[in-house]
């Protein structure tokens, strides 16, 4: 019963990276992750998130912002959170992408947020304006 009463949040890559990346640290993200870790809230995301994180780590390695071993450590840290991932309705994602003139990647998070009636946590200002 307790699981169903937890406030649910959809998280995207910008939100996760602001928590994981040493030079992008955000107090807001850290507070939310602490609440998640102590089981006060629930995080959910799309199956796409992990690919976005790995792509960001790869880009950051190429720019010498992090080392490959640091990327592996951050990936392990994220996976240790065991955040539930959902597949999305691709036709609805396409519709939202066209409606808001955003990528299908971004619209997948918006779709999940609407579908699961969960607040969307992002640091992408364009996406914040759509979901408010």
Language model segments and positions:
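Active-site neighborhoods of divalent-metal-dependent phosphate/nucleic-acid chemistry enzymes
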Residues: 81-126
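Alpha-helix capping/helix-boundary segments
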Residues: 15-16, 49, 109, 126-127
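Short, mixed-charge aromatic SLiMs
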Residues: 38-42, 75-84
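Short loop/helix-cap segments at secondary-structure boundaries that form the rim of catalytic
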Residues: 129-132
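Short, well-structured N-terminal submotif of metal-dependent ribonuclease cores
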Residues: 1-48, 60-69
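Active-site-proximal, substrate-binding regions of enzyme catalytic domains
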Residues: 54-81, 90
């Amino acid at each position: 019963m307790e699981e169903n009463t937890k406030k649910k949040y959809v998280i995207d890559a910008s939100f996760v990276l602001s928590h994981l990346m040493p030079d992008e640290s955000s107090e807001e993200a850290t507070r939310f992750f602490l609440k998640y870790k102590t089981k006060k809230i629930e995080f959910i995301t799309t199956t796409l998130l992990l690919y976005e994180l790995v792509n960001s780590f790869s880009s950051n390695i190429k720019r010498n912002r992090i080392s490959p071993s640091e990327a592996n450590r951050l990936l392990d840290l994220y996976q240790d959170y065991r955040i539930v991932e959902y597949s999305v309705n691709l036709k609805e994602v396409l519709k939202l992408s066209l409606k808001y003139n955003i990528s299908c990647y971004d619209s997948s998070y918006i779709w999940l947020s609407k579908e699961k009636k969960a607040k969307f946590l992002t640091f992408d200002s364009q996406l914040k304006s759509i979901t408010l």
